[in-house]
């Protein structure tokens, strides 16, 4: 069995271009050594699978049976990455292939690199495919909703082992370049299948890789050569526009650089990008402005639940100058009527989530105004999801959510299934069920507003209402509200520019 599965993996790796014919003996010996085999022979494989998942599952079952590993998620992940490492091309080979294709076509280069990242199982597509996704139509466009099931639950045995393992500071974080080829441990994922592509952005060294948890098509991470903190500045705009010069079919954006309104990793400067059109990109400009000194740059307020200024021009330098001017002005802007205070003492609150793209041969920047202030009423953040939406989403609203893609917690899968049962049975109250009592107010709203709930329409109803809740989340995160007071305050800010 093991001999046959190794042959299947070799055939798969040849088919996907991970190895060449001349690499077969080398890779087979690497695999035989990994499994402590005394001998190996080649077989003809007629039916080559399209993914490595089934082969890896068979090889992992053998490793468990032979006591090479314990049957836990973490140990299986560490070991299957070791397996795939035996059939991986060297980093220099991947870089050379990427750059050769890039000279001809940026789309071909990223397509090659993305397919390689999936074939190598670095992007665990079998897990990502478990995510529950749908679109919810709203007045702001179709919002993308994802219930994130791709990160498996931690095994108690792995948790216990992690407590006993020695903590190390290498690599310093999950985004450091030193992750490439890293063997991994119980506290840090193996990255032997990671290949990173060096890029020069604005005369500084960066790297391109794909996110192992792709939330949208070709979801990439652009990471700084140095382990330095996130900082939104003029350099950010220069780097983002430099990136879309290299890969004009991608967008690139940055999380904000302050807690609450930033992403989950603020310690390592990085951006995210990819080949996907979000609802925010499709959202129209609802009001145009002219800014003195920048009359030749298009400036507009985007029709979006959060507060977005869209600027566009063919002149990259002028666009960067205006973006910097808006950022500097916003950093020090306060409007008490909208609960916006730029500082508490010396602590700054205002920042921007920027997104760059090319549209009709022009550079375009969406600048999303953010504020991370807290108060007694909103201890988690005034412009952060409020209590009434925490049953659906209470985590930070980062770059991906800002653009209109909800990444919702895995718990919702089972909770929505229970809510569905109760709604079909027309139960008046769910406050006694500890698993879903947090949804009680929302549950009653659905019960009151939909008179003919049935098996046939319940899924559509719940998907629609979850999407509407996410829209509410985005409205909470908007600094200028979508009412007459908020929109006139938005105009007031733009007029001071």
Swiss-Prot record:
InterPro entries per UniProt: GalP_uridyl_Trfase_II (IPR000766), GalP_uridyl_Trfase_II_CS (IPR023425), GalP_Utransf_C (IPR005850), GalP_Utransf_N (IPR005849)
Pathway: Carbohydrate metabolism; galactose metabolism
Keyword Cytoplasm among UniProt keywords: yes
Presence of keyword Cytoplasm: yes
Keywords, in A-Z order: Carbohydrate metabolism, Cytoplasm, Galactose metabolism, Nucleotidyltransferase, Transferase
Cell compartment(s), UniProt: Cytoplasm
GO molecular function: UDP-glucose:hexose-1-phosphate uridylyltransferase activity
GO biological process: galactose metabolic process
Entry EC no(s): 2.7.7.12
Enzyme class per UniProt: transferase
GO CC terms in record: cytoplasm
Location (main, coarse): cytoplasm
The reaction(s) this protein catalyses: alpha-D-galactose 1-phosphate + UDP-alpha-D-glucose = alpha-D-glucose 1-phosphate + UDP-alpha-D-galactose
Family: Belongs to the galactose-1-phosphate uridylyltransferase type 2 family.
Protein's recorded name: Galactose-1-phosphate uridylyltransferase
Gene: galT
